[in-house]
Amino acid sequence: MTLYDLLELPQTATLQEIKTAYKRLAKRYHPDINKQGADTFVKINNAYAVLSDTTQKAEYDAMLRFSEFEDRVKRLDFSIKWHEQFMEELQFHHNWDFDFIRNREYTQPTPTNNKYSSFLDKDVSLAFYQLYSKGKLDFDLEDTLLRRHSIKQAFLKGKKLNDVLKEQYNYLGWLEAKRYFNIDVEIELTPKEVREGGVVNLPLKIKVISNNYPGQMWYELNKNYSFRLLWDIKNGEVAEFFGKGNRALGWRGDLIVRMRIVDKIKKRLRIFSSHFEQDKTKLWFLVPQDKQDNPNKWVFDYKTHEFIV
């Protein structure tokens, strides 16, 4: 199965046919209409993101024709494999150019207004993270980006590199895509736990993309955050911790914790998607058992933002 198959189209489909098919299928599988269609809805959105972009579509079509890929596609359902890489393994590549299929010289990604192009372009995403967090770029990254023809030409005309990047790539799209790596959780607490000021553990497995591990594109980092419960916690209170979420392409998502006071705990920890606002335990994270030992000997006071030994 290919991305065209996901949209129920032949590989000769035009951009207009792709757009029409996407609208029809998105309406059919939208979670608000079809409660069982959430996974398919995400898949067809991802397929449309590639096939609706002329540059990425050309790359994908070339890959379909590539003999090595044709041999591989006989042995696996490629749409499922591709979807797993997008949603689970996070094996992102330069501007969706699918370099993992074939070895060739690096080609400069073409600037595009695609919503997630800057997020998927590793160097640009790292640049935006540095601009977002400290307002400047590292020298080595500047040198790498200036090797791109379009950036170099604009820079030589006297424009500031920071402005060139934001003009040629979608900085606002990057900021929006960044939300996908927030971890949005809800914890259930009893009034007794709040009164006694106990400690609640939040064991999470965080997805990480890092160049420090050349043999693999991602790995899982075990984190066990601990919170000291204060007597004045209110039902619905929200605590946000910057940089404590998933990590990818140079930046970190945030951890957002909502407190829910209940008479009896039915489910200690719920993990939600900041995009779909629904239970996300199957998409990104494995939720450990509540009784798991806490390897973290430090307790974090979420109101003072200080660690307690």
Curated annotation (Swiss-Prot):
Superkingdom of source: Bacteria
Record keyword Chaperone present: yes
Molecular-function GO term, any one: misfolded protein binding
PROSITE patterns assigned: DNAJ_1, DNAJ_2
Domain J: 1-66
Keywords: Chaperone
InterPro entries the UniProt entry points to: DnaJ_domain, DnaJ_domain_CS, Hsp70_co-chaperone_J-domain, J_dom_sf
Name the UniProt record assigns to this protein: DnaJ-like protein MG002 homolog
Organism: Mycoplasma pneumoniae (strain ATCC 29342 / M129 / Subtype 1) (Mycoplasmoides pneumoniae)
Organism classification: Bacteria, Bacillati, Mycoplasmatota, Mycoplasmoidales, Mycoplasmoidaceae
